[in-house]
Regions:
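Short, low-complexity N-terminal intrinsically disordered segments enriched in polar/charged residues
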Residues: 1-35, 139-145
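A solvent-exposed, acidic/Ser-Thr-rich amphipathic alpha-helical stretch
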Residues: 6-8, 26-79, 83-86
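Polar/charged side chains located within well-ordered beta-strands of beta-rich proteins
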Residues: 10, 14, 81, 109-111, ...
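Short coil/turn motifs at secondary-structure junctions
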Residues: 86-90, 116, 126-128
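Exposed beta-sheet edge and beta->alpha loop/turn motif
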Residues: 88-114
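Low-complexity, intrinsically disordered terminal/linker segments enriched in charged
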Residues: 120-145
């Protein structure tokens, strides 16, 4: 597939992810995620069904999430995107009870595309920044008394 076609697939994934966060309909992602998807993210299970469960849980924790695509670069069968998401922490997330905090987090993804679907996805979110904004990890210069 041409680079522009692959970029369109990733753009569609981002649109569908927004739908998942709003509605919980993870099966909508089957349009762009291959059944044999391999997902790479620190601490995350690598298979499609586990990834879908994670996205559903994420949507419950951050139901007002909005995604802003900052950059997208394609070459060969890979598409890289850098995005920023903003959301309010309204439900449990990774064992952290809702804080009501408004978050801004950046992520970079590398996606490998074959036959019109994402077959492999590497995610590198700013987990330290996320945990600091949730109050799970102190920000630099902050200390517990």
């Amino acid at each position: 597939m041409a680079a522009e076609e692959n970029k369109a697939i990733l753009q569609r994934f981002n649109e569908l992810a927004g739908e998942v966060f709003r509605t919980g309909n993870v099966d909508a992602l089957d349009e762009v995620l291959a059944p044999e998807l391999v997902y790479h993210q620190p601490g995350a299970p690598p298979d499609l069904e586990s990834y879908k469960r994670f996205l559903a849980m994420f949507g419950l924790a951050f139901p007002d999430v909005s995604l802003t695509l900052e950059d997208m670069i394609a070459e060969g069968d890979k598409v890289v995107d850098r995005l920023t998401w903003q959301a309010t922490h309204q439900g449990p997330f990774m064992g952290i009870p809702p804080t009501g905090n408004r978050l801004t987090v950046t992520e970079i993804h590398i996606n490998r595309i074959a036959e019109g679907r994402i077959v492999e996805r590497w995610a590198q979110p700013d987990l330290l920044g996320l945990m600091q904004q949730l109050g799970a990890v102190p920000a630099p210069g902050q200390h517990d008394s």
